[in-house]
């Protein structure tokens, strides 16, 4: 998923930046419209057992390591997700998330446990204005640890207004919320 982005921006790998973790850092300097330069960091979960690391655990580790070592102003979490046609989603349609939640954490008990399990993490306060400026739709991102979906997952997604299914989104938002780092 990241290869076109890496090639477009000409970012180069910073070897062993996160060692001994498998996460990878790619970095370059970009010039903003105001003439100031900024560092663009692209962090990938890495690989293990000859396979790309995917899912909540890998995303949480990579996000935690990145925030602790890089101290970003904002985390932009981009990737490929599934959507629901009934909500207007279509192949290759670009969205900006308006919130992130977990859809596969079924924790019985009182409201506090249920609220904590689902997450419902906010995104960066400028997300709506950015979406309007770019003429992009917004949607609630839901996350689960499996590529498939159980009927009870779909029920949670529908009950909470989920529109986009992305395996890492809420995990990244969770870590950002702990470290008070804005996420888009």
Model-derived features: positions:
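A C-terminal functional module that forms or caps the active site or interfaces directly
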Residues: 151-184
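Glycine-rich beta-strand-to-loop/alpha-helix junction loops that act as flexible
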Residues: 44, 78-81
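N-terminal short beta-loop-beta anion/metal-coordinating cradle
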Residues: 1-64
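Proline-aspartate-enriched helix->loop->beta-strand connector
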Residues: 71-76, 162
